[in-house]
């Protein structure tokens, strides 16, 4: 049996120090790793059944892996058209992240690993229902949150 690496983090089960995301309901998250110099963020989100997060738009590629349940995604394109996708446990995808979308869990919820990459400090924008930017989220925001993770619990 190999020794655990210092960055090994379990992602399922009750032992996880999940956190709610601000005042949003229906999902919690755990930041796994932040590399400010490379502008990389790895995290896991756990959605309650049939819940969604908020509209947002990424500034770079996003890799996702459905660990448990389903990942439901509704993309909103520039022409206003919407495309709904359902990803099931074990599905891995890489997207450009360049269009607005909202995502959540399926009828039994969902636990999804995300890996964000960017060529700038800006990782994603939180959008309102009209897709206007409400807040810009940076790699440093993630770093600060991870650095203070145990202090907040």
Segments from the language model and where they lie:
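Short acidic-glycine-tyrosine-enriched beta hairpin
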Residues: 36, 77-106
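Glycine- and acidic-residue-biased ligand/ion/polar-headgroup-sensing regions
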Residues: 49, 58-78
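A short, N-terminal "cap"/entry segment at the start of jelly-roll beta-barrel domains
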Residues: 1-39, 83-85, 128-153
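Active-site region of the double-stranded beta-helix
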Residues: 31-38, 49-61
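A short hydrophobic beta-strand segment most commonly corresponding to one strand
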Residues: 94, 107-124
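His/acidic/aromatic-lined binding-pocket segments of jelly-roll/cupin-type domains
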Residues: 45, 54-57, 61-66, 84-85, ...
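Short, contiguous, helix-prone interaction/anchoring segments in small proteins
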Residues: 30-45, 112, 116
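Histidine-centered metal-chelating micro-motifs
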Residues: 51-54, 72-73, 91-103, 120-122
């Amino acid at each position: 049996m190999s020794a655990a690496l210092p960055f090994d983090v379990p992602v399922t089960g009750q032992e996880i120090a999940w956190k709610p995301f601000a005042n949003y309901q229906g999902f919690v998250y755990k930041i796994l790793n932040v590399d400010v110099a490379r502008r990389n963020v790895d995290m896991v989100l756990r959605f309650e059944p049939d819940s969604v997060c908020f509209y947002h738009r990424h500034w770079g590629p996003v890799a996702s892996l459905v660990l448990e349940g389903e990942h439901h995604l509704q993309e909103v394109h520039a022409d206003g058209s919407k495309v709904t996708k359902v990803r099931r446990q074990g599905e891995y995808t890489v997207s450009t992240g360049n269009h607005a979308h909202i995502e959540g869990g399926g009828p039994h919820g969902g636990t999804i690993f995300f890996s964000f990459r960017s060529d700038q400090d800006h990782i994603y924008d939180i959008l309102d229902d009209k897709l206007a930017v409400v807040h810009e989220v940076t790699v440093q925001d993630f770093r600060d949150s991870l650095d203070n993770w145990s202090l907040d619990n």
